[in-house]
């Protein structure tokens, strides 16, 4: 789909789009500050960052459709951002051990007409009570690096999740139903490319 640009550096988002039989013409990683604003609620944070990612790429590709997304995990109102720090990832895993937490993914589509549409999905995930050995082993695996909440549901962490409610694809990084709905407003998606 030459007229679609994916504003993301996530290989998982590209894979998920391909599940919809959509291959964007370009994939551009937006470089922006993803800091949380003081008092910002998790869902609003995800929606704002998804919008900013899409708009940043759209500013250089105004004749294209640009799709951006952002995923955030949170426990209560505490946002657990992506991390590359072992101590931070350990803290996240200790915090969600045996507890429910939420994962919100927002997706934004900017159209050449000037339309900017955002949708978001909140899912609930519950980890089993994690032992120190399980946390240490998971940290050694390294699969938590760069992941919201300090874990990757598509990896070994899936064995540590006792249940989830909501959209699996959203937890991975792109809510497929919502993405399909956004794109089908502009594209005929009922064909095989």
Swiss-Prot record:
This enzyme catalyses: a ribonucleoside 5'-triphosphate + H2O = a ribonucleoside 5'-phosphate + diphosphate + H(+); a 2'-deoxyribonucleoside 5'-triphosphate + H2O = a 2'-deoxyribonucleoside 5'-phosphate + diphosphate + H(+)
One CC-aspect GO term: cytoplasm
Question: What UniProt keywords are attached to this protein's entry?
Answer: Cytoplasm, Hydrolase, Nucleotide metabolism
Q: Give the principal location in a single coarse category.
A: cytoplasm
Instruction: Tell me if Cell cycle is a UniProt keyword of this record.
Output: no
What are the protein's GO molecular function terms? nucleoside triphosphate diphosphatase activity
Say which enzyme class the record assigns: hydrolase
Entry's EC annotation: 3.6.1.9
Biological role:
Nucleoside triphosphate pyrophosphatase. May have a dual role in cell division arrest and in preventing the incorporation of modified nucleotides into cellular nucleic acids.
Please state which protein family the record places this protein in. Answer: Belongs to the Maf family.
Do you know which PANTHER family this protein is assigned to? BIFUNCTIONAL DTTP/UTP PYROPHOSPHATASE/METHYLTRANSFERASE PROTEIN-RELATED, BIFUNCTIONAL DTTP_UTP PYROPHOSPHATASE_METHYLTRANSFERASE PROTEIN-RELATED
Q: What is this protein called?
A: Nucleoside triphosphate pyrophosphatase
What organism is the protein native to?
Answer: Anaplasma phagocytophilum (strain HZ)
